[in-house]
């Protein structure tokens, strides 16, 4: 997920308060103590959590030499980049060489360009403004941009009960909508979109903050492109929520519930040959997502049905994709 920092130099209490309320990740200030009095947030200051010149380097790009200096610093430290005439080209060059670049921006337009430069975007942005309304607007942009997911239709090939086991419900701190879900899989090479519990049914009330995600061993896709085991999710962590069009956003984990339940196995294949499978609870309220965004209960699922999923780079080490021979089956 992109970092959202706000520059409070010179001191601006309204901007800092709005930054904290909008979920900013850090505030750059002359005195960390001024920020800490308003709320808990990472500070970048001589007396802060991150110290300029040590943990964070600030560079102004004026020519190729300063660009090279920023790239060199970005190999092992966060670099805040400023340009005298804000352009995309220096950022493209820097993003190609470092994944620790934070771009200084002044408005929503500049923030959007920086977030999407070379598709992967910068590590984060530093907003320099005296207008709290701009802070809110840029915060909304950054927090809604957790990266798109390329969803494709999978054809169900098999579904059958496998017995009793432990499954995980992921309760988030967000209200999810119809068509929203999380991506899970028995392997890290392909995952299926499991629908949130947003729908009315005769048996239980909707729980629109919840996804009944799957068995404890399953992988879940996170906002930074990494994966985690469902059993390892914990309060305060973050998960990726995607709609049926692949638009992703981050959600905070409020709690997880692990309970022993009857399980079933779903297997599906994409047109390109990718094979996905997932073990889910065998209950009417557990649903996968059709290409049109509608929800299909696992009790009604049949071979030949189309459901959404994604194919990923297989092989993970501590949740990160690795290039080595790893077979998952």
Curated annotation (Swiss-Prot):
Pfam families: DHQS. Its EC number is 1.4.1.24. Keywords: Amino-acid biosynthesis, Aromatic amino acid biosynthesis, NAD, Oxidoreductase. InterPro entries: DHQ_synth. Signal peptide: none annotated. GO terms for biological process: amino acid biosynthetic process; aromatic amino acid family biosynthetic process. Transmembrane segments: none annotated. One of its GO terms (molecular function) is NAD binding. It catalyses: 2-amino-2,3,7-trideoxy-D-lyxo-hept-6-ulosonate + NAD(+) + H2O = 3-dehydroquinate + NH4(+) + NADH + H(+). It is an enzyme of class 1 (oxidoreductase). PANTHER family: 3-DEHYDROQUINATE SYNTHASE, PTHR33563. Belongs to the archaeal-type DHQ synthase family. Catalyzes the oxidative deamination and cyclization of 2-amino-3,7-dideoxy-D-threo-hept-6-ulosonic acid (ADH) to yield 3-dehydroquinate (DHQ), which is fed into the canonical shikimic pathway of aromatic amino acid biosynthesis. This is 3-dehydroquinate synthase.
């Amino acid at each position: 997920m992109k970092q959202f920092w706000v520059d409070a130099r010179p001191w601006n209490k309204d901007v800092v308060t709005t930054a904290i309320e909008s979920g900013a990740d850090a505030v750059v200030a002359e005195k960390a103590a001024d920020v800490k009095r308003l709320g808990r947030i990472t500070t970048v200051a001589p007396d802060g959590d991150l110290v300029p010149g040590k943990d964070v380097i600030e560079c102004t790009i004026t020519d190729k030499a300063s660009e090279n200096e920023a790239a060199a610093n970005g190999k092992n430290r966060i670099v805040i980049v400023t340009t005298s005439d804000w352009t995309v080209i220096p950022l493209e060059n820097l993003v190609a060489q470092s994944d620790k670049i934070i771009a200084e921006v002044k408005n929503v337009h500049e923030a959007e360009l920086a977030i999407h430069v070379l598709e992967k975007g910068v590590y984060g942005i530093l907003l320099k403004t005296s207008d709290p309304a701009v802070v809110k607007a840029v915060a909304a942009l950054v927090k809604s941009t957790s990266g798109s997911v390329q969803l494709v239709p999978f054809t169900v090939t098999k579904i059958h009960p496998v017995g009793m086991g432990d499954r995980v419900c992921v309760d988030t701190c967000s209200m999810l909508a119809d068509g929203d879900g999380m991506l899970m899989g028995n392997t890290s090479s392909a995952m299926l979109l499991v629908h949130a519990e947003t729908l009315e049914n005769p048996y239980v009330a909707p729980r629109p903050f919840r996804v009944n995600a799957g068995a404890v061993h399953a992988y879940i896709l996170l906002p930074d492109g990494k994966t985690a085991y469902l059993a390892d999710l914990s309060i305060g962590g973050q998960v990726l929520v995607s709609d049926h069009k692949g638009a992703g956003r981050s959600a905070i984990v409020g709690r997880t519930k692990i309970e022993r339940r009857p399980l079933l196995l779903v297997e599906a294949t994409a047109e390109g040959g990718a094979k996905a499978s997932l073990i889910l609870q065998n209950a009417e309220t557990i649903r996968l997502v059709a290409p049109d965004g509608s929800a299909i209960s696992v009790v009604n699922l049949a071979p030949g049905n189309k459901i959404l999923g994604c194919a990923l780079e297989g092989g993970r080490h501590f949740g990160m994709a690795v290039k080595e021979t790893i077979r998952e089956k």
